[in-house]
Amino acid sequence: MCLYPRLLKNKKYTKNNKNGGKIPAVSDERTLLVPVKCGNCLECMKAKSREWQIRLQEDIRHNKNGIFITLTFSDESYYKLAEEFYGIYGYLLDNQICKLAVRRFLERWRKKYKKSIRHWLITEIGHNGTKNVHMHGILWTDKVTEIEKIWQYGYVWTGNVKNGVRENYVNERTINYITKYITKKDLVNREYKPVILTSAGIGSGYIKRLDSKRNEFKGEKTKETYTTKSGHEVSLPIYWRNKSCIRTKSTVTIIVFGCKT
């Protein structure tokens, strides 16, 4: 539960298209305001991490070609990208550099293959060596050797090579590793807030599964939970609630690069 929720006006009691401009009678004044998660406290970050864990685990059920990836920046590339931002410094600059680099990486990929590469990346500040910002995550592609050529900003880790065979895998353990950065306590970079850069529709395959039928709107009998592989019932991610047309008192949409995810 959010530690610092904000209270916003309940749109139900304002003139809108849904009510035809006729505000319904207020039976309880407490319903005039609705609590909305702050999105920044520890509890909100934990909830965000759990939702991404579920969505990513669901996604790899349907997309089998995901690889664990680490994208870095050389000093030269970092400072060259930094020159494109004026009046931005510190951690904000680090995140802006990552956004720009990923956007250009995707543009180069689309130019060569006529299609974007499915991705989920999260930023982190380094602690050794250059201490430059870098990214961990998953890229869904069979063209592993092309990643470093098209990235162009620094070293790319795509797995260890043993006896000429590249070892790389994406499973539940991998997902737990990358999503931990959402809530990771960095004692050196205490004020740093990581950014998630992602393709739209991560985990959307769940909507096509028969299991999702149990989440369709059925009034008071509507099921708003998701069953994990271990059999645990957890809260259904907001993304699926919206996709399944489940009606709740409040909804949150995550937006990355202007795209609903």
Describe the role of every protein-language-model region:
Residues M1-K131, T141-T261:
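Right-hand nucleic-acid polymerase module
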